[in-house]
Amino acid sequence: MADKSDSEAVALLMEAIVTTPDTNSEPQYQSQHRDLQECYYSDSDNEKATEFLRRIGKHQHKKKNSVKKRVTFLVYF
């Protein structure tokens, strides 16, 4: 069973704003208060997706006796 930090990390990851890679097309989800060219998480106005994932990865490696879990996300454009 996942601990609280794992559950929060997955919840934050699921709340990501997904934008299309083509800058000429309309994004699937438009945020009124964030830059549409970047992918940010709903709990942070300045943490990018890559920074968030890097922080979670560092946290996971520091945990002792943790069970590695694989989470797969499908993003449709």
Curated annotation (Swiss-Prot):
Family statement: Belongs to the alphaherpesvirinae envelope protein US9 family.
Gene Ontology annotations of biological process type: intracellular transport of virus
Pfam families for this protein: Herpes_US9
Cellular component aspect of the GO annotation: host cell
Motif range (Di-leucine internalization motif): 12-13
Protein name per UniProt: Envelope protein US9 homolog
